[in-house]
Amino acid sequence: MTLRSALDDYKRTRNDARVFPGERRSTTGTFSGLDERLVYVDRDGWHRDYSYPLSGLGGVNRSRFGVESLDGTLWVEDFETLSQDYVGDTALVKTVHDAGDFTVTQHDLTLGAVHLTRLELVGEFTTEPTLHAFFDLTPEQQESRLGKLEHEDTIEIHHDRQHNLVTASTGLDDVFGQLPEQFGELVSATDTVSYPRSQSGGSKYEDALLNGTVVLEIPFDVEDTGTETVATTTVASLLFDTDDTARQAGLDAVAEAAVAHDTVAALREAATDQVDVTVPDDTPRRDLAVEDLRVLSLLAADTGAHIAGPDPDPFYVYTGGYGYTWFRDDSEIARYLLEADERLGIGLDDWLDRSAAFYMDTQLDDGSWPHRVWA
Protein backbone atom coordinates (compact mmCIF):
# COMPACT_ATOMS: atom_id res chain seq x y z
CA MET A 1 0.00 0.00 0.00
CA THR A 2 1.27 3.45 -0.94
CA LEU A 3 0.59 6.73 0.83
CA ARG A 4 -2.10 7.66 -1.71
CA SER A 5 -4.02 4.42 -1.34
CA ALA A 6 -3.57 4.46 2.45
CA LEU A 7 -5.08 7.95 2.70
CA ASP A 8 -7.97 6.89 0.47
CA ASP A 9 -8.62 3.84 2.64
CA TYR A 10 -8.40 5.97 5.79
CA LYS A 11 -11.18 8.24 4.52
CA ARG A 12 -13.32 5.24 3.63
CA THR A 13 -12.89 3.34 6.91
CA ARG A 14 -11.99 5.80 9.68
CA ASN A 15 -15.45 5.51 11.27
CA ASP A 16 -15.53 1.71 11.06
CA ALA A 17 -15.12 0.19 14.51
CA ARG A 18 -14.01 -3.18 13.13
CA VAL A 19 -11.00 -2.25 10.95
CA PHE A 20 -7.79 -0.25 11.22
CA PRO A 21 -7.89 2.61 8.69
CA GLY A 22 -5.07 2.50 6.16
CA GLU A 23 -4.15 -1.15 6.65
CA ARG A 24 -3.75 -3.75 3.90
CA ARG A 25 -6.47 -6.22 4.77
CA SER A 26 -6.21 -9.85 3.64
CA THR A 27 -8.95 -11.57 5.65
CA THR A 28 -11.53 -12.51 3.02
CA GLY A 29 -9.35 -14.21 0.40
CA THR A 30 -6.28 -16.40 0.22
CA PHE A 31 -2.65 -16.40 -0.96
CA SER A 32 -0.55 -17.85 -3.76
CA GLY A 33 3.23 -17.90 -4.09
CA LEU A 34 5.56 -20.61 -2.81
CA ASP A 35 8.67 -18.94 -4.25
CA GLU A 36 9.92 -15.35 -4.21
CA ARG A 37 6.59 -13.54 -4.66
CA LEU A 38 3.57 -13.59 -2.31
CA VAL A 39 0.22 -12.50 -3.79
CA TYR A 40 -3.14 -12.14 -2.05
CA VAL A 41 -6.20 -13.10 -4.11
CA ASP A 42 -9.47 -11.68 -2.80
CA ARG A 43 -12.83 -13.40 -3.18
CA ASP A 44 -13.89 -10.36 -5.22
CA GLY A 45 -11.32 -11.26 -7.89
CA TRP A 46 -8.66 -8.60 -7.38
CA HIS A 47 -5.13 -9.30 -6.16
CA ARG A 48 -2.29 -7.48 -4.38
CA ASP A 49 1.39 -8.12 -3.73
CA TYR A 50 2.82 -8.76 -0.27
CA SER A 51 6.16 -9.67 -1.84
CA TYR A 52 8.52 -6.94 -0.69
CA PRO A 53 9.71 -8.51 2.61
CA LEU A 54 10.48 -11.80 0.83
CA SER A 55 12.05 -10.58 -2.41
CA GLY A 56 12.68 -6.85 -2.10
CA LEU A 57 10.40 -6.33 -5.11
CA GLY A 58 7.33 -4.07 -5.12
CA GLY A 59 4.44 -5.24 -7.25
CA VAL A 60 0.68 -4.85 -7.58
CA ASN A 61 -0.73 -2.33 -5.11
CA ARG A 62 -4.29 -2.31 -6.48
CA SER A 63 -6.09 -4.22 -9.23
CA ARG A 64 -9.58 -4.76 -10.66
CA PHE A 65 -11.01 -6.94 -13.40
CA GLY A 66 -14.15 -6.21 -15.39
CA VAL A 67 -16.01 -7.46 -18.46
CA GLU A 68 -17.14 -4.91 -21.04
CA SER A 69 -20.74 -5.30 -22.19
CA LEU A 70 -23.36 -3.20 -23.98
CA ASP A 71 -24.35 -1.80 -20.58
CA GLY A 72 -20.81 -0.73 -19.70
CA THR A 73 -18.14 -2.50 -17.70
CA LEU A 74 -19.33 -5.19 -15.29
CA TRP A 75 -16.78 -5.48 -12.48
CA VAL A 76 -16.01 -8.90 -11.05
CA GLU A 77 -16.21 -7.53 -7.50
CA ASP A 78 -19.93 -6.87 -8.09
CA PHE A 79 -20.62 -10.50 -9.05
CA GLU A 80 -21.72 -13.10 -6.52
CA THR A 81 -18.72 -15.17 -5.46
CA LEU A 82 -19.78 -18.81 -5.20
CA SER A 83 -16.54 -20.35 -3.94
CA GLN A 84 -12.81 -19.91 -3.45
CA ASP A 85 -10.53 -22.87 -2.76
CA TYR A 86 -7.04 -24.21 -3.28
CA VAL A 87 -6.73 -26.87 -5.96
CA GLY A 88 -5.49 -30.07 -4.30
CA ASP A 89 -2.27 -29.72 -2.32
CA THR A 90 -1.08 -26.77 -4.40
CA ALA A 91 -1.13 -22.97 -4.06
CA LEU A 92 -3.32 -22.66 -7.18
CA VAL A 93 -6.39 -20.62 -6.18
CA LYS A 94 -9.74 -21.26 -7.90
CA THR A 95 -12.53 -18.69 -7.51
CA VAL A 96 -15.97 -18.99 -9.11
CA HIS A 97 -18.21 -15.95 -9.69
CA ASP A 98 -21.84 -15.81 -10.85
CA ALA A 99 -22.61 -12.86 -13.13
CA GLY A 100 -26.18 -13.88 -13.93
CA ASP A 101 -26.01 -14.49 -17.68
CA PHE A 102 -22.58 -16.08 -17.38
CA THR A 103 -20.18 -17.55 -14.85
CA VAL A 104 -16.55 -16.58 -14.34
CA THR A 105 -14.03 -19.21 -13.26
CA GLN A 106 -10.79 -17.60 -12.13
CA HIS A 107 -7.50 -19.41 -11.49
CA ASP A 108 -4.61 -17.57 -9.82
CA LEU A 109 -1.08 -18.95 -9.49
CA THR A 110 2.18 -17.27 -8.51
CA LEU A 111 5.29 -18.92 -9.95
CA GLY A 112 8.59 -17.36 -8.97
CA ALA A 113 8.24 -13.66 -9.81
CA VAL A 114 5.28 -14.22 -12.17
CA HIS A 115 1.62 -14.04 -11.18
CA LEU A 116 -0.96 -15.58 -13.50
CA THR A 117 -4.71 -14.92 -13.56
CA ARG A 118 -6.73 -17.07 -15.95
CA LEU A 119 -10.34 -16.03 -16.52
CA GLU A 120 -12.91 -18.27 -18.21
CA LEU A 121 -16.36 -16.88 -18.97
CA VAL A 122 -19.13 -19.34 -19.86
CA GLY A 123 -22.67 -18.31 -20.77
CA GLU A 124 -24.57 -15.93 -23.02
CA PHE A 125 -23.25 -12.57 -24.24
CA THR A 126 -25.01 -9.84 -26.21
CA THR A 127 -21.67 -8.85 -27.74
CA GLU A 128 -18.18 -10.34 -27.84
CA PRO A 129 -16.72 -9.66 -24.38
CA THR A 130 -13.55 -7.69 -23.63
CA LEU A 131 -11.60 -7.78 -20.38
CA HIS A 132 -10.79 -4.52 -18.62
CA ALA A 133 -7.86 -4.91 -16.21
CA PHE A 134 -6.82 -2.07 -13.90
CA PHE A 135 -3.39 -2.19 -12.23
CA ASP A 136 -1.62 0.13 -9.83
CA LEU A 137 2.00 -1.02 -10.02
CA THR A 138 4.68 0.11 -7.56
CA PRO A 139 8.22 -0.98 -8.53
CA GLU A 140 10.61 -0.42 -5.61
CA GLN A 141 7.54 0.56 -3.54
CA GLN A 142 7.33 3.86 -5.46
CA GLU A 143 4.08 5.52 -6.54
CA SER A 144 5.52 8.48 -8.47
CA ARG A 145 8.54 9.31 -10.65
CA LEU A 146 7.86 6.13 -12.59
CA GLY A 147 8.25 5.44 -16.28
CA LYS A 148 5.55 3.81 -18.42
CA LEU A 149 6.47 2.06 -21.67
CA GLU A 150 4.12 0.35 -24.12
CA HIS A 151 5.56 -2.60 -26.01
CA GLU A 152 3.66 -4.51 -28.69
CA ASP A 153 1.65 -6.64 -26.26
CA THR A 154 3.13 -5.70 -22.88
CA ILE A 155 2.97 -2.69 -20.56
CA GLU A 156 6.09 -1.84 -18.56
CA ILE A 157 6.22 0.29 -15.39
CA HIS A 158 9.73 0.99 -14.11
CA HIS A 159 11.61 3.04 -11.53
CA ASP A 160 15.39 2.82 -11.11
CA ARG A 161 16.33 -0.85 -11.10
CA GLN A 162 12.99 -2.62 -10.86
CA HIS A 163 10.56 -3.19 -13.71
CA ASN A 164 6.99 -4.50 -13.57
CA LEU A 165 5.53 -6.05 -16.73
CA VAL A 166 1.95 -7.03 -17.56
CA THR A 167 0.71 -8.91 -20.61
CA ALA A 168 -1.95 -11.42 -21.62
CA SER A 169 -2.01 -14.65 -23.59
CA THR A 170 -4.41 -13.00 -26.05
CA GLY A 171 -2.43 -9.76 -26.34
CA LEU A 172 -3.51 -6.20 -25.54
CA ASP A 173 -6.04 -4.23 -27.58
CA ASP A 174 -5.42 -0.90 -25.87
CA VAL A 175 -3.66 0.77 -22.93
CA PHE A 176 -4.94 3.80 -21.01
CA GLY A 177 -2.91 5.76 -18.49
CA GLN A 178 -4.68 6.94 -15.37
CA LEU A 179 -4.46 10.22 -13.49
CA PRO A 180 -3.26 9.57 -9.92
CA GLU A 181 -4.93 11.15 -6.91
CA GLN A 182 -4.35 14.89 -7.07
CA PHE A 183 -3.32 17.11 -4.17
CA GLY A 184 -6.82 18.49 -3.62
CA GLU A 185 -8.24 14.98 -3.51
CA LEU A 186 -5.57 13.81 -1.08
CA VAL A 187 -6.07 16.63 1.43
CA SER A 188 -9.86 16.57 1.22
CA ALA A 189 -11.43 15.11 4.34
CA THR A 190 -14.15 13.30 2.40
CA ASP A 191 -13.24 12.89 -1.29
CA THR A 192 -12.28 9.34 -2.26
CA VAL A 193 -11.09 8.12 -5.64
CA SER A 194 -12.22 4.97 -7.45
CA TYR A 195 -10.27 3.46 -10.32
CA PRO A 196 -10.34 3.32 -13.21
CA ARG A 197 -11.22 6.97 -13.75
CA SER A 198 -13.30 8.02 -16.73
CA GLN A 199 -10.55 10.34 -17.95
CA SER A 200 -7.24 8.93 -19.14
CA GLY A 201 -4.96 11.89 -18.45
CA GLY A 202 -4.49 15.22 -16.75
CA SER A 203 -3.82 18.78 -17.82
CA LYS A 204 -0.27 17.86 -18.73
CA TYR A 205 0.84 15.15 -21.14
CA GLU A 206 2.99 13.46 -18.50
CA ASP A 207 0.31 13.35 -15.78
CA ALA A 208 -0.84 9.86 -16.75
CA LEU A 209 2.61 8.62 -17.74
CA LEU A 210 4.78 9.11 -14.66
CA ASN A 211 2.86 6.81 -12.33
CA GLY A 212 1.97 3.13 -12.16
CA THR A 213 -1.80 3.25 -12.73
CA VAL A 214 -2.99 1.78 -16.02
CA VAL A 215 -6.06 0.20 -17.63
CA LEU A 216 -5.64 -2.58 -20.17
CA GLU A 217 -8.22 -3.68 -22.74
CA ILE A 218 -7.64 -7.38 -23.32
CA PRO A 219 -9.43 -9.51 -25.93
CA PHE A 220 -10.75 -12.94 -25.04
CA ASP A 221 -10.22 -16.11 -27.02
CA VAL A 222 -13.89 -16.80 -27.83
CA GLU A 223 -15.42 -20.16 -28.79
CA ASP A 224 -19.09 -20.76 -29.58
CA THR A 225 -20.03 -24.34 -28.69
CA GLY A 226 -23.52 -24.04 -30.12
CA THR A 227 -25.22 -23.99 -26.72
CA GLU A 228 -23.02 -21.44 -24.96
CA THR A 229 -20.07 -19.12 -25.46
CA VAL A 230 -16.71 -19.73 -23.78
CA ALA A 231 -14.25 -16.82 -23.49
CA THR A 232 -10.77 -17.20 -21.97
CA THR A 233 -7.55 -15.27 -21.40
CA THR A 234 -4.57 -15.45 -19.03
CA VAL A 235 -3.11 -12.23 -17.60
CA ALA A 236 0.51 -12.38 -16.43
CA SER A 237 2.59 -9.93 -14.41
CA LEU A 238 6.33 -10.15 -13.77
CA LEU A 239 8.55 -8.30 -11.28
CA PHE A 240 12.27 -8.16 -12.01
CA ASP A 241 15.41 -6.24 -11.17
CA THR A 242 17.66 -5.20 -14.04
CA ASP A 243 20.69 -6.03 -11.91
CA ASP A 244 19.65 -9.67 -12.32
CA THR A 245 17.52 -9.78 -15.49
CA ALA A 246 17.86 -7.90 -18.78
CA ARG A 247 14.76 -6.06 -20.01
CA GLN A 248 14.37 -8.18 -23.13
CA ALA A 249 14.73 -11.35 -21.10
CA GLY A 250 11.94 -10.10 -18.83
CA LEU A 251 9.69 -9.26 -21.78
CA ASP A 252 10.27 -12.71 -23.25
CA ALA A 253 9.68 -14.42 -19.90
CA VAL A 254 6.33 -12.78 -19.13
CA ALA A 255 5.02 -13.40 -22.65
CA GLU A 256 6.07 -17.05 -22.53
CA ALA A 257 4.51 -17.48 -19.09
CA ALA A 258 1.14 -16.14 -20.24
CA VAL A 259 0.98 -18.34 -23.33
CA ALA A 260 2.33 -21.45 -21.61
CA HIS A 261 -0.32 -21.27 -18.86
CA ASP A 262 -3.42 -20.46 -20.88
CA THR A 263 -5.18 -23.70 -19.88
CA VAL A 264 -6.30 -25.04 -16.52
CA ALA A 265 -4.31 -28.22 -17.14
CA ALA A 266 -1.10 -26.23 -17.61
CA LEU A 267 -1.73 -24.26 -14.42
CA ARG A 268 -2.43 -27.42 -12.43
CA GLU A 269 0.74 -29.08 -13.72
CA ALA A 270 2.88 -26.05 -12.86
CA ALA A 271 1.28 -25.75 -9.42
CA THR A 272 1.89 -29.43 -8.69
CA ASP A 273 5.54 -29.17 -9.73
CA GLN A 274 5.93 -26.15 -7.44
CA VAL A 275 5.12 -28.12 -4.26
CA ASP A 276 8.47 -29.40 -2.95
CA VAL A 277 7.11 -31.68 -0.19
CA THR A 278 4.41 -34.29 -0.82
CA VAL A 279 2.61 -35.37 2.33
CA PRO A 280 2.16 -39.19 2.33
CA ASP A 281 -1.43 -40.35 1.87
CA ASP A 282 -1.39 -42.33 5.13
CA THR A 283 -0.38 -39.31 7.25
CA PRO A 284 -2.83 -38.82 10.15
CA ARG A 285 -5.04 -35.77 9.55
CA ARG A 286 -3.31 -35.27 6.23
CA ASP A 287 -5.43 -32.27 5.23
CA LEU A 288 -4.18 -30.29 8.22
CA ALA A 289 -0.56 -31.19 7.46
CA VAL A 290 -0.99 -30.02 3.86
CA GLU A 291 -2.53 -26.72 4.99
CA ASP A 292 0.20 -26.06 7.57
CA LEU A 293 3.03 -26.77 5.13
CA ARG A 294 1.38 -24.60 2.47
CA VAL A 295 1.18 -21.66 4.90
CA LEU A 296 4.83 -22.06 5.91
CA SER A 297 5.86 -22.24 2.25
CA LEU A 298 3.96 -19.03 1.52
CA LEU A 299 5.81 -17.23 4.33
CA ALA A 300 9.26 -18.71 3.60
CA ALA A 301 12.17 -16.79 2.13
CA ASP A 302 15.02 -18.31 0.13
CA THR A 303 17.18 -18.07 3.24
CA GLY A 304 15.01 -20.59 5.10
CA ALA A 305 13.53 -17.91 7.35
CA HIS A 306 9.80 -17.27 7.73
CA ILE A 307 8.22 -13.83 7.99
CA ALA A 308 5.65 -13.37 10.75
CA GLY A 309 2.87 -12.88 8.21
CA PRO A 310 1.71 -10.89 5.17
CA ASP A 311 2.37 -7.36 6.40
CA PRO A 312 -0.91 -5.43 6.89
CA ASP A 313 0.80 -2.33 8.26
CA PRO A 314 3.55 -1.08 5.91
CA PHE A 315 3.71 2.31 7.65
CA TYR A 316 4.06 0.74 11.14
CA VAL A 317 1.10 2.67 12.53
CA TYR A 318 -0.43 -0.19 14.51
CA THR A 319 2.33 -2.82 14.77
CA GLY A 320 6.07 -3.34 14.83
CA GLY A 321 5.92 -5.01 11.42
CA TYR A 322 5.05 -8.49 10.17
CA GLY A 323 7.49 -8.58 7.25
CA TYR A 324 10.34 -9.63 9.52
CA THR A 325 11.67 -12.91 10.86
CA TRP A 326 11.20 -12.93 14.63
CA PHE A 327 13.75 -15.43 15.92
CA ARG A 328 11.74 -16.70 18.87
CA ASP A 329 8.75 -17.52 16.65
CA ASP A 330 10.80 -18.93 13.78
CA SER A 331 12.85 -21.19 16.05
CA GLU A 332 9.68 -22.60 17.60
CA ILE A 333 8.32 -23.33 14.13
CA ALA A 334 11.54 -25.15 13.21
CA ARG A 335 11.42 -27.19 16.42
CA TYR A 336 7.78 -28.18 15.86
CA LEU A 337 8.58 -29.19 12.28
CA LEU A 338 11.48 -31.34 13.48
CA GLU A 339 9.30 -33.08 16.07
CA ALA A 340 6.45 -33.60 13.59
CA ASP A 341 8.78 -34.99 10.93
CA GLU A 342 10.35 -37.41 13.40
CA ARG A 343 6.89 -38.78 14.23
CA LEU A 344 5.25 -38.67 10.80
CA GLY A 345 8.15 -39.12 8.37
CA ILE A 346 6.95 -36.47 5.92
CA GLY A 347 10.45 -35.74 4.59
CA LEU A 348 11.31 -32.23 5.73
CA ASP A 349 15.10 -32.64 5.79
CA ASP A 350 15.71 -29.89 3.22
CA TRP A 351 13.45 -27.47 5.10
CA LEU A 352 15.25 -28.14 8.37
CA ASP A 353 18.67 -27.83 6.72
CA ARG A 354 17.73 -24.38 5.37
CA SER A 355 16.54 -23.28 8.81
CA ALA A 356 19.76 -24.47 10.45
CA ALA A 357 21.88 -22.67 7.85
CA PHE A 358 19.88 -19.48 8.41
CA TYR A 359 20.47 -19.60 12.18
CA MET A 360 24.19 -20.19 11.66
CA ASP A 361 24.46 -17.26 9.26
CA THR A 362 22.65 -14.84 11.59
CA GLN A 363 24.11 -15.87 14.95
CA LEU A 364 26.05 -13.07 16.65
CA ASP A 365 29.61 -13.39 17.95
CA ASP A 366 28.41 -13.81 21.54
CA GLY A 367 26.23 -16.79 20.57
CA SER A 368 22.92 -14.93 20.69
CA TRP A 369 20.59 -13.81 17.89
CA PRO A 370 19.08 -10.40 17.16
CA HIS A 371 15.43 -9.83 18.05
CA ARG A 372 14.37 -9.83 14.39
CA VAL A 373 15.87 -9.51 10.92
CA TRP A 374 14.66 -9.07 7.37
CA ALA A 375 14.00 -12.49 5.85
Predicted regions and their residues:
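Alpha-helical packing segments of well-folded alpha/beta enzyme cores
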Residues: 115-117, 288, 329, 355
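Helix-terminus loop motifs that line ligand-binding clefts
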Residues: 300-314, 342-375
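Terminal accessory carbohydrate-recognition/targeting modules of carbohydrate-active enzymes
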Residues: 1-283, 338-346
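Generic, well-ordered alpha-helical scaffold segments in large soluble proteins
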Residues: 291, 295-299, 336-337, 358, ...
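The feature captures the catalytic groove of carbohydrate-active enzymes
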Residues: 231-253, 309-326, 371-375
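Well-ordered alpha-helical segments within folded domains of soluble proteins
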Residues: 323-341, 345, 349-353
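Conserved oxyanion/phosphate-binding beta-strand-loop segments in alpha/beta enzyme cores
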Residues: 277-318
